[in-house]
Amino acid sequence: MGSRFLLALFLVLLVLGCEVQAAQQLQQDDPGSPALLDKVQESISSYWDTAKAAAQGLYQKTYLTSVDEKLRDMYSKSSAAMTTYASIFTDQIFTLLKGE
């Protein structure tokens, strides 16, 4: 899920970067055209809205409640086990250092 989000974010940034670069080239050709600037802003806004909707759709499509609950349960059990084993290990180290 995280890698898909990063991929979508990368694609959005790539599209925006290409759009900005094209806008800069067009702006250098005709710097006094406000209509061109409006078109570029609308284009960037539409690309952003499309990418945002696609990312939200992808997130909602891949989100599974049962998997989320299983992951939370596995995390809580494994962290409880690690806490127990860390306590035992710490106790053993103290016993070795104290010499009893």
From Swiss-Prot:
Residues 66-74 are annotated as: Lipid binding. Residues 1-22 form the signal peptide. Component of chylomicrons, very low-density lipoproteins (VLDL), low-density lipoproteins (LDL), and high-density lipoproteins (HDL) in plasma. Plays an important role in lipoprotein metabolism as an activator of lipoprotein lipase. This is Apolipoprotein C-II. Keywords: Chylomicron, HDL, LDL, Lipid degradation, Lipid metabolism, Lipid transport, Secreted, Signal, Transport, VLDL. The keyword Lipid metabolism applies. It comes from the Eukaryota. One of its GO terms (cellular component) is chylomicron. Belongs to the apolipoprotein C2 family. Proapolipoprotein C-II is synthesized as a sialic acid containing glycoprotein which is subsequently desialylated prior to its proteolytic processing. It is found in: Secreted. GO terms for molecular function: phospholipase activator activity; phospholipase binding. Residues 78-100 are annotated as: Lipoprotein lipase cofactor. The keyword Transport applies. One of its GO terms (biological process) is lipid transport.
